[in-house]
């Protein structure tokens, strides 16, 4: 599995497998090594192919097997791909619960990680808004920390895009409350502009009110001047 050619050979066998015999054999052989293989430069591709081809029962066993190491795997440059593929293939409430519980305490750390942020974004894109509440709670609670980060500002925008109305207001409220510091940040100012572009009149008015007393100062600053200009349009 860790050999480039061996890995390709096994992937080809999985593609050719019409009766699930090969899939069953590979599953039994690698399940106990799945954590290590997911982070391997070649093994991760076999894991991805297996997750695509295996049965729901086998997939649940894989999710159970990696759940304790999911954060560690997600931060790995190879492992992140295998975790994203796993999230794409999730089918049962139990699988979703296991993934959610595994990631719950590390949302902000993953968002700020070069590889881990893609796992959080995959959850946002793939899972239902109510299944992603743990992400919305984390980014709302750590709003400034998330929004002023290179990866975090992008994740916050995706959260807003895929949230329910209630979740959207939860996030927008935190952005509004922290607007004065966010508009002065190289990344945070883009998120405030993004919220303004949503065209929610009451939110735009509240944001403008929060910034009004600091208008001259903000107009002279590199990042916040962009937000002031948008407010005036």
Where is each model-derived feature located?
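Eukaryotic gene-expression regulator signature that favors modular helical reader/repeat domains
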Residues: 1-233
């Amino acid at each position: 599995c860790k050999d480039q050619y061996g890995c390709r050979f096994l992937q080809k066998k999985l593609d050719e497998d019409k009766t699930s015999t090969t899939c069953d054999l590979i599953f039994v052989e690698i399940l106990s090594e799945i954590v290590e293989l997911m982070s391997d430069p070649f093994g991760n591709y076999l894991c991805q192919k297996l997750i695509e081809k295996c049965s729901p029962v086998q997939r649940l066993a894989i999710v159970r097997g990696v759940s304790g190491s999911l954060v560690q795997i997600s931060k790995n440059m190879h492992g992140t791909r295998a975790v994203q593929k796993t999230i794409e293939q999730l089918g049962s409430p139990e699988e979703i619960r296991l993934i959610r519980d595994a990631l719950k305490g590390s949302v902000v750390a993953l968002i700020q990680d070069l590889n881990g942020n893609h796992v959080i974004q995959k959850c946002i894109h793939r899972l239902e808004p109510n299944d992603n509440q743990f992400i919305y709670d984390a980014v709302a609670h750590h709003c400034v920390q998330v929004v002023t980060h290179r990866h975090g500002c992008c994740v916050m925008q995706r959260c807003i895009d895929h949230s329910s109305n209630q979740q959207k207001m939860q996030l927008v409220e935190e952005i509004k409350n922290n607007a004065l510091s966010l508009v002065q940040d190289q990344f945070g100012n883009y998120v405030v502009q993004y919220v303004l572009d949503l065209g929610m009149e009451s939110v735009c008015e509240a944001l403008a009110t929060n910034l009004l007393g600091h208008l001259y100062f903000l107009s002279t600053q590199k990042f916040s001047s962009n937000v002031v200009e948008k407010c005036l349009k």
